[in-house]
Amino acid sequence: MMSFHNQPILPAIRNMKQFDEFLNSSFSYGVILDIHLGQLKGVIKEAQKHGKNMMVHVDLIQGIKHDEYGAEFICQDIKPAGIISTRSNVIAKAKQKKIYAIQRLFLLDTSAMEKSMEFIGKHKPDFIEVLPGIVPSLIQEIKEKTGIPIFAGGFIRTEEDVEQALKAGAVAVTTSNTKLWKKYENFLTESD
C-alpha cells in the first residue's frame, strides 16, 4: 500500500491547539484548514522550525482572494509545501510555482464528478483530495480514471473509515480527528 511520505494520515489542522499537537507529533506533513492570512506566515515558519511541512487549504484562508493572484502570493511569500483548492486556476499556479498542487473534489453527483474530471485532465494536479472520503468505490474509480494519487477527506471518523479509504487506493487520509492522528502516529513509530 502506497502512502504519502510514509504517512497514512495527513493531520488537518483547524485551530492552534491542534497545531501545537501536530508540532509535538512525529508527522512530517500536515494541512492547515481555517486560518487568517495574518497568522499564516508565522504558522508556516513555526512548523518549519520543527521540521514540519505544511499544505495550505487556500479556499479557507480568511483575508485573501481565492484566485491565482492570491495563490501566487502564498506560493512566493508564505512558501508552503503545497496548496489545496477546488479552483483549477489556483492549482495551475501551484504547479507553475513547483509546490504540491492538490485539487479538492466534492463528489456531489455524477455531473459534478464529470465536470471535475475535465478540470483534472486539463490541469493535472499532483494529488486529488476526494470528499467525502468514505466512499471507497468512488476513490477507486477516480484513481483508475486519472492515475493521480488520491487523498480521502471528509466524514473520516473511525479507523475503519481510514482503512477502507486506504484499501480503495487513497495514498493518505486527511482528518482533523486527533484520536485518529494518535492511532496512526503509533503506526508511524512502529514501522520505523
Curated annotation (Swiss-Prot):
InterPro entries: Aldolase_TIM, GlpP. Induction: By glycerol 3-phosphate. Repressed by glucose, glucose 6-phosphate and fructose 6-phosphate. Pfam families: G3P_antiterm. Regulates expression of the glpD operon. In the presence of glycerol 3-phosphate (G3P) causes antitermination of transcription of glpD at the inverted repeat of the leader region to enhance its transcription. Binds and stabilizes glpD leader mRNA. May also regulate expression of the glpFK operon. Keywords: Glycerol metabolism, RNA-binding, Transcription, Transcription regulation. The keyword Ubl conjugation does not apply. GO terms for molecular function: RNA binding; transcription antitermination factor activity, RNA binding. Disruption phenotype: Defective in glycerol 3-phosphate uptake. Noninducible for glpK and glpD. Is able to grow at concentrations of the antibiotic fosfomycin that is not tolerated by the wild-type. This is Glycerol uptake operon antiterminator regulatory protein. It comes from Bacillus subtilis (strain 168). Coiled coil: none annotated. GO terms for biological process: cellular response to glucose stimulus; glycerol metabolic process; negative regulation of termination of DNA-templated transcription; positive regulation of DNA-templated transcription; response to antibiotic; transcription antitermination. The keyword Methyltransferase does not apply. The gene is glpP.
